[in-house]
Design a protein with these regions (language model features):
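Extracellular hydrolytic enzyme modules, especially secreted metalloproteases
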Residues: 68-70, 140-142, 146-307
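Zymogen propeptides/activation segments of proteases
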Residues: 1-180, 276-308
Length: 308
């Protein structure tokens, strides 16, 4: 039903990407800013979220790895992803000012919360530290807002986790044209800290991946998407977000440059090693139509793919 579709989707998605000229490898830094509201305080600490994003072997409350661990595994050790966590800072207005639903059900002012977060952050950091590819843009700004996310069934006044693009602004001589955000707490009741799945999905956008589910449902046709097999689809919620799925092979190969692709040109018997650990385990079969091809990989229940 529509409610289920809404729970499985992220609104305000940015499907456009800045051009990439190099593989997403090496040391990368992201800026994570914790924001409470005038009427909703943060219950977790900066240290709590530093652990969720950065701690190797993170195991708080049943977790099976941190955001750092996730990107280390899915990149086959090629990406070392560190998040600098700042805050929490207090927003000027109550939660409903930012998260109430406006036209089409979209949140009315989450961009204002982002601007307030940046005003606090630039007093403490140098934005040039967050431009790994040297293109003059801040690579990744992620907001963690107090309380729950609307996508988990929280109040309509809550913010829905998303990534958004906007006309670029300039701060400290650096351009910023996107941000992402997820909630402090998981679900819609209780005090459990958020899981890494939604964070990995939204940060996947910042690195250059698109959504792989039907973002407009039946408008212009329907698309079943990559489902639980892909963090950029329903797979961000695998095992309640504890063990989000790997990226699909197209993203790994062509967006991020993490895997090698072997094009098969002759009939024969071929073997595929599990792609969880084998970075050159993808085959390509061209169909004969320009730009149309299949990618083949072997997926097993292992590592962050354990909940497939």
């Amino acid at each position: 039903d529509e409610a289920q579709k809404k729970r499985l989707s992220y609104r305000n998605r940015a499907v456009e990407k800045r051009g990439r000229h190099a593989a997403v490898v090496g040391e990368r830094r992201a800026l994570v800013i914790l924001m409470s509201f005038a009427d909703v305080s943060f219950t977790k600490t900066e240290a709590d979220f530093d652990a969720l994003f950065n701690e190797p072997g993170y195991a708080v409350d049943g977790a099976q790895g941190s955001v750092y661990d996730y990107f280390r595994e899915v990149s086959y050790g090629q990406l070392s992803f560190h998040c600098d966590v700042l805050g929490p800072y207090r927003a000027v207005y109550p939660m409903a000012y930012y998260g109430s639903n406006g036209y089409g059900g979209s949140d009315v002012n989450p961009y204002v919360l982002f601007l307030e977060a940046m005003e606090h952050a630039v007093r403490e950091i140098d934005l040039q530290d967050y431009d790994a590819d040297g293109d003059g843009y801040v690579d990744n700004v992620h907001i963690v807002f107090a309380g729950y996310g609307e996508e988990a069934g929280a109040s309509p006044s809550a913010i829905w986790s998303h990534e958004a693009m906007f006309p670029e602004i300039t701060m400290q001589g650096m351009k910023i044209d996107r941000y992402s955000c997820t909630p402090e707490l998981r679900g819609n009741r209780g005090g459990g800290i958020s899981r890494i799945g939604p964070c990995c999905h939204e940060m996947g956008h910042a690195l250059g991946a698109m959504d792989y589910y039907d973002t407009d449902y039946t408008t212009g046709g329907s698309f079943e998407g990559t489902g639980v097999w892909d963090v950029m689809a329903q797979g961000s919620w695998n095992n309640d977000g504890i063990t989000p799925a790997h990226f699909n092979p197209y993203v790994k190969a062509y967006d991020f440059g993490w895997v090698g692709v072997t094009t098969l040109t002759h009939t024969g018997d071929y073997s595929l090693h599990p792609s969880t650990w084998e970075k050159d385990g993808v085959y390509r079969v061209d169909t004969g139509s320009e730009g149309d091809f299949y990618l083949l990989e072997s997926r097993v229940r292992d590592g962050f793919d354990t909940a497939l």
